[in-house]
């Protein structure tokens, strides 16, 4: 019997190419979703306003998983004076690919005076999957953004080891003039680095949180670092990457996490976001309703 989380034969032989374009702007004292275009199975739910003028949206991918050959493109822009919060309702599953790469490309642009919280749930990379996850973030001086990504290698809840396959993580975060952080990582299921102390040390979950804007200071990084764990099953560290070259250059905080339990990693990242939101956006943190369901 086919596992309910495994794609049908049809899903493995066909491919989805889907895109979603979202634009946010300040209108009549609150943030409005002024443009939403989609092709294929990517959608966004009707905007909600649990924080008054801040616009909340939930990005939906009805197939719930990404199979070999699929490509998802998400393009987000936040204008000056607007504040958007975007999340996903569940984990993104990357299925066994039968040799074909699957890809997701997220592009984020925040204007001066704009604010964004990009808070998707984790990616679960199945054994034999080939996943390419690309994120490009450009935040103009005076704008701010907080976002994260987490990856679980293998269906750990089902006892599956990630023994074969490949994962590429390509991330760029910066301002219009320069990148403050560029990551180009390649994970191979059979690589000995996954078990090496200098690699993942046998842990199978990795998370990254970035926060870019005027509030990203060394003092904030040090305050956050005091509460981060460093033990065998959950490790985290934070650094401040300061801008340079001009008086308006952006700075960012970068939090990296390794763990063995997704719930623990998730709670750590939510706690960090809770600490960072006020100094980064000037708005107190309010946990998303999605996180309690």
UniProtKB/Swiss-Prot annotation:
Belongs to the UreD family. This is Urease accessory protein UreD. Coiled coil: none annotated. It is found in: Cytoplasm. GO terms for molecular function: nickel cation binding. The keyword Membrane does not apply. PANTHER family: UREASE ACCESSORY PROTEIN D. Keywords: Chaperone, Cytoplasm, Nickel insertion. InterPro entries: UreD. Required for maturation of urease via the functional incorporation of the urease nickel metallocenter. UreD, UreF and UreG form a complex that acts as a GTP-hydrolysis-dependent molecular chaperone, activating the urease apoprotein by helping to assemble the nickel containing metallocenter of UreC. The UreE protein probably delivers the nickel. It comes from Cupriavidus metallidurans (strain ATCC 43123 / DSM 2839 / NBRC 102507 / CH34). It comes from the Bacteria. GO terms for cellular component: cytoplasm.
